Swiss-Prot record:
UniProt source species: Saccharomyces cerevisiae (strain ATCC 204508 / S288c) (Baker's yeast)
Domain of life: Eukaryota
InterPro entries (UniProt xref): DUP/COS
Keyword terms: Membrane, Transmembrane, Transmembrane helix
Record-given protein name: Putative DUP240 protein DFP1
Membrane-spanning intervals of the chain: 4-24, 26-46
Cellular component terms per the entry's GO annotation: membrane
Family of the protein in this entry: Belongs to the DUP/COS family.
Ranges in a coiled coil: none
Membrane topology: Multi-pass membrane protein
Compartments, as annotated in UniProt: Membrane
Pfam families named among the record's database cross-references: DUP (PF00674)
Amino acid sequence: MINFLLFVLTILATLTNIWFSGVLSPAMVIRICLGGSMVVLQIWSFSRPISNETFRTKLLLEVITHRPSIAGKEWKTITYNMNQYLFKAGLWKTPYHFFCEHQCYEFFKDLIKGKYPDVQWDTANTQPFISVPENQAATQNSDVEPTVKWCLFKAAEIQAHAVREYWQSQYPDVGIPAI
């Protein structure tokens, strides 16, 4: 916010110098300053990350419901549903394109990374299991409610499955174990 104020003051000082040279009228200086500050405020408000916990839980549940592949059309459906949710919840001003499917997928990956331990695969029987370092489970997830923990676990499991299937289909001769 301080940077914003310094930015506005710099513009105001520059415009005042131009005004004194007779190029701009006082009304034009005021309009330019107000218009510029409104543009900067709009950009700032749209660049803030969504911090609504319900939004995160809804995204995880969408992933669990649709079970998307890495490059699948399911991400378009999930993205559409999330954009509609953001609009209806008042977190975005229009129902159009807060996320594209690539941004939504990246947001999802960032959401599950570090919040819950990675799902790993037992190469003997190719069944997913969770490897939780002793101190990680107690420290990172202690403030997350059980439903969200379950959603994080299940979504991470689905993501690991999708990644495995993707690479298996890309390189079938390598011998990646079937899931």
